[in-house]
Amino acid sequence: MKIFSVTDPEFKPYGRVVTGLDTTKAEILAALANTPLPAATDYVAEDAALQELPAAVEVSEHLFGGMPCQLGWCNGHNTYLNCLEYHRDSEFNLGTEDFVLLLARQEEIAGGKLDTATVKAFRVPAGTLVEVYATTLHYAPCHVDAAKGFRVLVALPKGTNTAKPAIKNDGGDDPQLWACNKWLLAHPDSAEAKAGAYVGLVGENVHI
């Protein structure tokens, strides 16, 4: 699978590289370096050590326009797609090491299904802050170097990925709602599908 860079023009429909905020990025990277590095993949929606940084205020004000936000992380080792998710808002990522994002576009969903042949891979250099647009489907990062794994900031509006509301399926993308502000399409081979997530990915479970 070809791996593009987030600096390539192919990334433009999916997100952007955020420039500036050098002090903010340095604070976050220093704190991220002290977070766990599991053998598999782990996600924490809001990490107290990150949330208490002065950088958290900067993220809220500069990246979310003053909206309350949460700073968490996704760390570990991974080489598979497994699922794709989207939110109603952008997500911001920043890694201590190079990592790869597997991405698709919401408009590529047809009849509640997405063909994984449409997925593209983008390498994010260490220390590069990226915005992943709300219309971009994404999931856990993939590592570039198995010896280093990945430690990646996940900044989102506050409450995202917490417990979902108790709603009945009333059409639209309701069946895909897996958590608060999180709509998920799982591959049938994934652990999420076995746990009851909506199976919306068809084709190969992309592996890099």
Report residues per predicted region.
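Active-site region of the double-stranded beta-helix
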Residues: 1-126, 140-208
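Histidine-centered metal-chelating micro-motifs
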Residues: 128-130, 135-139
